[in-house]
Amino acid sequence: MKIFVDENIPLMTVRALREMGHIVTDIRNTPDKGMADDDVWAMVQREKQLLITTDKGFAQYRNKQHHGILIVRLRKPNRHKIHQRIIKAITQFSEKKWHGILIVMRDTVQGVWRSADRN
């Protein structure tokens, strides 16, 4: 699966996703580091990638057509907790099921929203 990880995702997660066979774009390794959310969104859609972030602002795109959004929102985040929640979500859904899905992973629960525009 093609995945884009925002700057706030642990490097251990990037490595684990690559070891699982995913094609991962890590913005930290590009000249685009620090780009605006709208520009990140446009790039992710152009490249047909699942977006993984801790930035709740990306939830605003949930009703648009997209290739999946995974937002991790924890009360006391640390890289190990963020990593665990991401790996759990990635293994829970197949690549085809991510299309048009927003998942918010919290400490003990997860929320799932399906886009109104899942074309």
Residue ranges and their predicted role:
Residues K2-P10, R106-N119:
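Metal-dependent nucleic-acid phosphoesterase active-site entry motif
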Residues K2-Q49:
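N-terminal first-folded block
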Residues D26, T53, I71-R73, V104:
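Structural signal for conserved beta-strand scaffold positions within catalytic alpha/beta enzyme cores
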Residues L74-V112:
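C-terminal structural segments of small proteins and small subunits
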